[in-house]
């Protein structure tokens, strides 16, 4: 899991001469869930937009070691209401083998709902659909921008389990943005703490062993709360 797949190198971003992101450095590894934890409005979404190329950094470099496509799971599912679930997944890659679409729908537990329209799906199912769509577009790297925040606790943790399943079964690298410490501890292997104005990565916390040791898990939670 230590193979680098994506690196942010000295990334800074200004809006109208106001510095928003300041010297952001981190690396993503193959087959890990990397958490990005910080308060709302600090610049986490801006950083994700830079990673996928929809915004340009003021300075610094993004290194994508395999020139991999990057899939994006937004806060809102952004499914097209006039398309079926199958069509929503297919639209990101019209020439793709439909077998892959079926595999991804099955992976997220929606194979039997392929002909449903978004209005017929629950909030959790719609987000599963958006995950299937992101998977179909990009098989190696996914960015999750707080996509579970509007869901109840049960659904949130079902989708966190799905995220861990993608890592385990497909070796997918995931950058998971959240402001929820409990979610981060439950799902992530490492957590980056973003804070300050302008925003910086203040600390990296490795928590992959804390799930085995209950005492260590409590210590990590205390450490995270202190950092935030």
Residue ranges: model-predicted function:
Residues 37-39:
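The feature captures the beta-strand-to-loop junction immediately N-terminal to the Walker
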Residues 52:
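Helix-to-loop junction immediately C-terminal to a conserved catalytic motif
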Residues 98-113, 163-165:
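Conserved ABC ATPase "signature" region
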Residues 117-121, 125:
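Conserved ABC ATPase signature
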Residues 131:
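Hydrophobic anchor residue at the start of the ABC signature
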């Amino acid at each position: 899991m230590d193979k680098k797949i994506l690196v942010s190198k000295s990334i800074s971003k200004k809006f109208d001469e106001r510095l928003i992101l300041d010297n952001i450095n981190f690396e993503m590894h193959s087959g890990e869930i990397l958490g990005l934890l910080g308060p709302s409005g600090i610049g986490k979404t801006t950083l994700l937009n830079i990673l996928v190329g929809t915004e340009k950094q003021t300075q610094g470099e993004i290194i994508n070691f395999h020139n991999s496509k990057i899939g994006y799971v937004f806060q809102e599912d952004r499914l097209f209401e006039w398309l079926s679930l199958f069509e929503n997944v297919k639209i990101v890659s019209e020439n793709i083998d439909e077998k892959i679409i079926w595999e991804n729908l099955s992976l997220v537990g929606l194979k039997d709902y392929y002909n449903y329209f978004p209005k017929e799906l629950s909030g959790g199912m719609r987000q599963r659909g958006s995950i299937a769509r992101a998977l179909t577009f990009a098989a190696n790297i996914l960015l999750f921008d707080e996509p579970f925040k509007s869901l109840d606790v049960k659904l949130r943790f079902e989708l966190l389990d799905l995220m861990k399943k993608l890592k385990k079964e497909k070796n997918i690298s995931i950058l998971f943005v959240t402001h929820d410490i409990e979610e981060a501890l439950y799902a992530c292997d490492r957590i980056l703490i973003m804070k300050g104005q302008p925003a910086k990565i203040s600390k990296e916390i490795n928590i992959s062993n804390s799930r085995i040791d209950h005492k260590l898990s409590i210590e990590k939670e205390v450490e995270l709360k202190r950092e935030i």
